[in-house]
Amino acid sequence: MLTLASKLKRDDGVKGSRTTSTTLDSMRRISVRDRLLVKEVAELEANLPCTCKVNFPDPNKLHYFHLTVSPDESYYQGGRFQFEIEVPDAYNMVPPKVKCLTRIWHPNITETGEICLSLLREHSIDGTGWAPTRTLKDVVWGLNSLFTDLLNFDDPLNIEAAEHHLRDKDEYRNKVEDYIKRYAR
């Protein structure tokens, strides 16, 4: 799966047979992002929450993948929620772009897939936003936690969902279950 890692190893293995300028050209072609992703994807796959699964539509493009979260507790238990994760060229100075592809009734995810998760913010006044020390593992664990301990009704992106929960928790649960049946199986 890590074909980029294989390419990096091949490139490193033939260094001695190339001229210095050719080696430098080869090193420049492999972006900092891609070098980081080889390591981070391996770490991610080794430390994936049991409720998550990653899928790389093109194994040569580690900067684009899908994440499926299947919560085993909370309102969202029994659902399968798909996320699209795209890692920009400026990674790790900027966070990955994440979108929820599954329609969901959630206070921190809009029905159109926008996500409110502090570590995905490029600039954050409270210090919980993106930092170059964060990794894809942090992103995946954060998305997974949106269905459990990071489920936040007090600072919602989807205000209507948060107000619905405040007004009638049973009806909120029913709507979540309806969305799971219709969109998240």
Curated annotation (Swiss-Prot):
Keywords: ATP-binding, Nucleotide-binding, Transferase, Ubl conjugation pathway
Active site: C116
Gene Ontology MF terms: ATP binding; NEDD8 conjugating enzyme activity; NEDD8 ligase activity
UniProt-listed InterPro entries: UBQ-conjugat_E2_core (IPR000608), UBQ-conjugating_AS (IPR023313), UBQ-conjugating_enzyme/RWD (IPR016135)
Intrachain S-S bonds: none
E.C. designation(s): 2.3.2.34
Family recorded in the similarity comment: Belongs to the ubiquitin-conjugating enzyme family. UBE2F subfamily.
Record's protein name: NEDD8-conjugating enzyme UBE2F
Organism expressing this protein natively: Xenopus laevis
Lineage start: Eukaryota, Metazoa, Chordata, Craniata, Vertebrata
